[in-house]
């Protein structure tokens, strides 16, 4: 590694103070930077990412755009208040509308496919089906959709169809957001691992010894947060995404949910 002393010009360019530094270039971090810059056009905003591209969950998921199934809502109501569950549903819906307006459906291959919640247990299906009218009433009040859920059958399985769901390409979504942010004048530092966070002096230190200061710091590193803030009790949960080999005459098309939303699957193209 070359440890050459920086020139006057380099120091003027790279060692100045920012109005906002965001650590983590996933969807959350880039969105924070995006809206901060739009609200403060003259501000200097920097996003720091340890990889050559975002390496967290933002681009390592199944590409669902959903606000929840009846099975999921019922499971949530067993451990949370009705008010909290309703708030989350409304915020999910509003967040998806905002995402689509910022990114553009065509820029992330968004398909408004609707969805099906699949059941293999008769009692679970009957319990969920009894709640259709209840949750349709919720959706009318929360998102203006009076008939979101309906009873049906899919590929021989009892199911509940829902209208407000879609699928998208997470990689294209993030790529588009990067382009938009660069057009706004937001700076990026790729392959830059932040190893130190100084809240008192509002600065971060990198693995290469660089110190960067900002009036505002945002840590948007999700599962990696404990490496910078070991005192915070964050335990990441591991999820798995499996991509099948090509399947001839694939009949499962759309987005599907199973087991109270803990298992979900979708098609990719016509044969996966």
Predicted regions and their residues:
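Glycine-rich active-site loop/strand segments that organize a redox cofactor
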Residues: 56-91
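Flavin (FAD/FMN) cofactor-binding and adjacent substrate-gating region
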Residues: 71-77, 101-179, 184
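Glycine-rich Rossmann-fold phosphate-binding loop(s) that bind the pyrophosphate
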Residues: 24-30, 50
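Glycine-rich, N-terminal phosphate-binding loop of Rossmann-like dinucleotide-binding domains
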Residues: 25, 69, 221-222
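Extreme N-terminal leader/targeting segments of oxidoreductases
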Residues: 1-20, 38-39, 43-44
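Active-site substrate-recognition segment that forms the wall
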Residues: 40, 50, 63, 106-111, ...
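Helical element adjacent to the flavin cofactor pocket in flavoenzyme catalytic cores
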Residues: 159-216, 220
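Glycine-rich FAD pyrophosphate-binding loop
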Residues: 37-60
């Amino acid at each position: 590694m070359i440890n050459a002393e920086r020139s006057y010009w380099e120091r003027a360019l790279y060692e100045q103070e920012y109005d906002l530094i965001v650590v983590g270039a996933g969807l959350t971090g880039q969105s924070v930077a995006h809206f901060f810059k739009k609200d403060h056009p003259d501000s200097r905003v920097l996003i720091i990412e340890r990889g050559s591209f975002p390496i967290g969950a933002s681009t390592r998921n199944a590409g669902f755009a959903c606000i929840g199934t009846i099975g999921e809502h019922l499971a949530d109501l067993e451990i949370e208040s009705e008010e909290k569950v309703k708030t989350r549903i409304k915020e999910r819906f509003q967040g998806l509308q905002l995402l689509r307006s910022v990114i553009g459906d065509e820029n992330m291959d968004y398909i408004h496919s609707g969805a099906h919640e699949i059941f293999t247990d008769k009692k679970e299906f009957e319990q969920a089906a009894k709640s259709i009218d209840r949750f349709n009433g919720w959706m009318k009040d929360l998102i203006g959709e009076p008939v979101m859920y309906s009873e049906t059958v899919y590929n021989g399985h009892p199911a509940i169809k829902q209208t407000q769901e879609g699928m998208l390409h997470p990689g294209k979504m993030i790529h588009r957001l990067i382009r938009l942010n660069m057009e706004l004048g937001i700076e990026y530092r790729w392959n830059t691992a932040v190893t130190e966070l100084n809240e008192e002096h509002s600065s971060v230190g990198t693995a290469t010894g660089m110190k960067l200061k900002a009036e505002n710091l945002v840590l948007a590193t999700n599962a990696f947060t404990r490496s910078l803030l070991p005192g915070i009790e964050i335990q990441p949960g591991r999820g798995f995404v499996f991509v099948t080999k090509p399947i001839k005459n694939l009949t499962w098309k759309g987005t599907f949910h199973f087991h109270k939303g803990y298992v979900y699957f979708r098609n990719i193209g016509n044969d996966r």
